[in-house]
């Protein structure tokens, strides 16, 4: 959520910044609501003062024994009380309208975010590795997995529906190996604290990280028995939600920052609006797994922390020897809650192009304001909003796709990357039994 004080001070300047994201701020509506809020707030304060003043007069009239005046003043108090309650109701309504408007406004883009409307306008920052030149026509992961009888989409359709997968034997083990390798690297090499979190979260948590109310259509909602006293829950679209909410409503000591969390979870997305896109294979699924990295830090270091975060995700690809490129997202492709984002795209021979495998974002104080995640500044002694960042380190399914396609052999077998061999019990090749 944006700082409403900044929005009140100069809504036109905020609107100009938001245009980089392709968002048109309704300044007229905001200004109208603000004027109403201020007028009703002044009226409320005046009514409160008037009632307090009359209440004092009642006390004086009672002391002097003037019962008639006291009765008259009590009638005035009752009228003022009714007017005050009506004004408070109006003020609450206007504040709720303002809150609803604010919840729909995206985060401001960083000054370094390039102009642009779509992913075609993203700017490449660097590349690592060279795509392998095969002396045969490389297959995609679907053909490879099905030929080895380790990847079964038909079974998934039978069990659940489209955009799900069933993995067997060594492919399932390779998927697990990737997960363990990623977590171990981030925990042991990069100093992250591993956390295990719920896969179901409440609406408050999703609101805190920015998925609600705007993106409810992308979520899987799980109705809960109202008699239990619980509200409906949602399957997590990313571990970013439960992990970042660990600091919701907290005031962290400076000595406790910055925090670095790593979590492995399944993720669930309805992929609303993705009809017809990536219908083949494991690129875009309703259920997939990710190793998520979350940082909570002081505001003065969040820009350098973003660079660190991207570097940690890149290390995984380097250790797997998978070619990739890193791009900075343009304003039009930037996420709702993001201030600045780098995407890491891995080379997929089966598609002949780079595809996103990690998205690393600095959310600035946008999520922290929604969650009231704060730290105590030792210089002032006062609580201030922290900065939050997150990124995939990496998307496990897409990494598996990249390994299959980049490490394939002419006979349809797949070599296991050297760094994963210990996780595979020494197995070096995946092939049909």
From Swiss-Prot:
Signal peptide residue numbers: none
One Pfam entry name: Seryl_tRNA_N
Any one biological process term the GO annotation gives: selenocysteine biosynthetic process
EC number: 6.1.1.11
Binding-site residues, ATP: 269-271, 356-359
Reaction catalysed by this enzyme: tRNA(Ser) + L-serine + ATP = L-seryl-tRNA(Ser) + AMP + diphosphate + H(+); tRNA(Sec) + L-serine + ATP = L-seryl-tRNA(Sec) + AMP + diphosphate + H(+)
UniProt-listed CDD domains: SerRS_core
Binding annotation for L-serine: 238-240, 292, 392
Top EC class of this enzyme: ligase
Highest taxon listed in the record's lineage: Bacteria
Keywords: Aminoacyl-tRNA synthetase, ATP-binding, Cytoplasm, Ligase, Nucleotide-binding, Protein biosynthesis
Primary site of residence: cytoplasm
Stored PANTHER family: SERINE--TRNA LIGASE, SERYL-TRNA SYNTHETASE
UniProt family annotation: Belongs to the class-II aminoacyl-tRNA synthetase family. Type-1 seryl-tRNA synthetase subfamily.
Domain notes per entry: Consists of two distinct domains, a catalytic core and a N-terminal extension that is involved in tRNA binding.
Function statement: Catalyzes the attachment of serine to tRNA(Ser). Is also able to aminoacylate tRNA(Sec) with serine, to form the misacylated tRNA L-seryl-tRNA(Sec), which will be further converted into selenocysteinyl-tRNA(Sec).
Protein name in UniProt: Serine--tRNA ligase
Lineage, top ranks: Bacteria, Pseudomonadati, Pseudomonadota, Gammaproteobacteria, Oceanospirillales
